[in-house]
């Protein structure tokens, strides 16, 4: 097989490139494109022999695209226009312009690529931009399948539910193709169970209007229970976390932790402990789960990722018992017994599937590393999709 010639758009720190390597598909990345200067430094540090174009995608002409002579596109367009916490500007968001430029260029290429893989946030599947993408690739003759996948399905203790699309230039559909459906798991062989469907794409307009109640985790049922237990958690949330920690198909976090680190430099400051005590998602090295790490991790506390309890012999329930009735000093003393720390950038990179040799230039700060990793993707998930796509 001739090595594939892959074009990596919105390359970031090189998650797609790393996944392509892991897939063991013979391939060369002919060019990577990104405007983020810090991300580009990290990319060059890890992939020094790849042509890196530090320019906007809108600035690349049809002729320049043709000259690159690629037959595969790997891309992870900006997710902010589609996030739940963003404004969801969709096609009207200026950050979508570069992707619209790609959709405009694609049908006019001298030679269409054979393969396309796209990653984005959950929510992209409900967007007008997604509709334009589907319309464009269908008109070009691609067969495609959409997915919503999390690394937990590969035994990795990190929730990072993301949208993926794989497309292949061929007349026959994929063996697992489910028209109008978004698959919630990797394709099974015929001897295994049929795939789960998340969304019927035809009905998504009505779903937008009614605002469906969605269970994001297939391991638990949507529960009406609202009993607040310790911290600001409902009985349903506690139950879900216990179920995740009991799932023996998922590895423990300790497999992904660094041995020799200065723990103290990653401890949560007392002010954060006081302010966010009831909102923290606390995990232990023996836990089999962690929240999605976002680009604000280490800087913001709420909703940006889990924190690690390093004293395993202390029961968290005992620490939180009657916490609200204590003075500030007593609260800090009690919470400090948990020795809560942030995950290090290296540990997050491990959970995202980057190999041990993947590194950061010394000049990059911890804050920059968190930000870049929060914008990246899970290498193992993408590697598996590349194998499925090229099979």
Swiss-Prot record:
Return the CDD domains for the record. Answer: Cyt_C5_DNA_methylase
Query: What would be one Gene Ontology cellular-component term for the protein?
Result: nucleus
| Catalytic activity, as annotated | cytidine(38) in tRNA + S-adenosyl-L-methionine = 5-methylcytidine(38) in tRNA + S-adenosyl-L-homocysteine + H(+)
A Pfam family hit: DNA_methylase
The record lists S-adenosyl-L-methionine as bound by: 13-15, 34, 57-58, 76, 376
Q: What is its EC number?
A: 2.1.1.204
Q: Which UniProt keywords apply?
A: Cytoplasm, Methyltransferase, RNA-binding, S-adenosyl-L-methionine, Transferase, tRNA processing
Show which residues constitute the signal peptide: none
The top EC class is transferase
Q: What does this protein do?
A: Specifically methylates cytosine 38 in the anticodon loop of tRNA(Asp). Has higher activity on tRNA(Asp) modified with queuosine at position 34.
**What's the protein called, per UniProt?**
tRNA (cytosine(38)-C(5))-methyltransferase
Please report the organism this UniProt entry assigns to the protein. Bos taurus
What are the leading ranks of the lineage? Eukaryota, Metazoa, Chordata, Craniata, Vertebrata
């Amino acid at each position: 097989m001739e090595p594939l010639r892959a074009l990596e758009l919105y390359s970031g720190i090189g998650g797609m490139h790393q996944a392509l390597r892991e897939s063991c598909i013979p391939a060369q990345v002919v060019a990577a494109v990104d405007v983020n200067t810090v991300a580009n430094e990290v990319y060059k540090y890890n992939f020094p022999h790849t042509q890196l174009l530090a320019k906007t995608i809108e600035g690349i002409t049809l002729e320049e695209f043709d000259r690159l002579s690629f037959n595969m596109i790997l891309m992870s367009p900006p997710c902010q226009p589609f996030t739940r916490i963003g404004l969801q500007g969709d096609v009207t968001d200026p950050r979508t312009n570069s992707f619209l430029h790609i959709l405009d260029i694609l049908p006019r290429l001298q030679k269409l690529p054979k393969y396309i893989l796209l990653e984005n946030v959950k929510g992209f599947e409900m967007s007008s931009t997604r509709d334009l993408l589907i319309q464009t690739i269908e008109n070009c003759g691609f067969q495609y399948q959409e997915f919503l996948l999390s690394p937990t399905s590969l035994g990795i203790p990190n929730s990072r539910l993301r949208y993926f699309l794989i497309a292949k230039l061929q007349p026959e559909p994929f063996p697992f193709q489910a028209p109008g459906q978004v698959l919630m798991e990797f394709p099974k062989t015929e001897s295994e169970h049929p795939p789960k469907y998340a969304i019927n794409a035809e009905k998504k307009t009505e779903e937008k209007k009614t605002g469906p109640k969605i269970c994001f985790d297939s391991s638990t049922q949507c529960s009406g229970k609202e009993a607040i237990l310790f911290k600001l958690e409902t009985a349903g949330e506690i139950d879900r976390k216990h179920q995740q920690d009991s799932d023996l198909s998922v590895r423990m976090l300790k497999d992904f932790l660094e041995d020799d680190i200065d723990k103290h430099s990653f401890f949560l400051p007392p002010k954060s402990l006081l302010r966010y005590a009831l909102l923290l998602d606390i995990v232990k090295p023996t836990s089999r789960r962690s929240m999605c790490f976002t680009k604000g991790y280490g800087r913001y506390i709420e909703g940006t990722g889990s924190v690690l309890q390093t004293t395993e012999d202390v029961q968290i329930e005992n620490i939180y018992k009657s916490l609200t009735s204590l003075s500030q000093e007593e609260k800090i003393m009690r919470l400090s017994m948990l020795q809560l720390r942030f995950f290090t950038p290296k540990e997050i990179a491990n959970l995202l599937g980057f190999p041990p040799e993947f590194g950061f230039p010394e000049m990059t700060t911890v804050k920059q590393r968190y930000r870049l990793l929060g914008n990246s993707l899970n290498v193992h998930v993408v590697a598996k999709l590349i194998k499925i796509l090229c099979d």
